[in-house]
Regions:
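Short S/T/G/P-rich N-terminal loop/turn motif that feeds into the first structured element of a domain
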Residues: 1-68, 80-83, 107-158
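Tryptophan-centric aromatic hotspots in well-structured domains and transmembrane helices
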Residues: 74-76
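An amphipathic, aromatic/His-enriched active-site/gating alpha helix that lines ligand/cofactor pockets
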Residues: 78-111
Length: 158
């Protein structure tokens, strides 16, 4: 993990980008053969994305809470995310096809979800204090110091 930045900073959002949440919820632990492939597929996709910046992926972080695993991803655009999702020569499409075949079995052993948000300059507010330089939206697009003109959330949003 990156060294923490000991001053207050904010994300330096210069253009539109995408926040993509994707994850899974293990509904039936003992049906390991149904949820384990989905669990194991995600890290290989993330490695592929970091190795190929031309795909438009910026960064990701994984969070676990109980039975739910969520990967928070930042992308340059919705079009880049959509293009990657449909590329048959990349890791996502084959993994999705295999998962979908298992998911239609109707056991409900694993649930999946994703949410996509378009983030535009002037419509997002961030604040980081004593956080690692690679954390969150600021880690994806870069950070800049909070100044007297950006003290409040409203000022940072503008």
């Amino acid at each position: 993990m990156a060294k923490h930045i000991p001053v207050r900073t904010m994300a330096d959002v210069k253009g539109p980008l995408v926040l993509f949440l994707i994850g899974m919820r293990i509904n039936t632990f003992w049906r390991v053969w149904e949820w384990l492939p989905a669990f194991l597929a995600m890290p290989t996709m993330i490695v592929e994305l970091y190795k190929n910046p031309e795909l438009g992926f910026l960064s990701a972080r994984t969070e676990m809470a109980g039975r739910t695993i969520t990967v928070i991803q930042y992308w340059k655009s919705f079009e880049a995310l959509e293009a990657y999702a449909s590329m048959s020569d990349r890791k996502h499409r084959p993994a999705w096809t295999a998962f979908y075949k298992r998911a239609t079995s109707g056991t409900g052993a694993v649930g999946i979800f994703h949410e996509t948000y378009i983030v535009r300059p002037g419509e997002v507010e961030t604040l980081y204090a004593d956080m690692p330089a690679d954390f969150g939206l600021g880690g994806a697009v870069g950070m800049k110091p909070v100044t007297p003109k950006t003290e409040t959330a409203r000022e940072r949003k503008g």
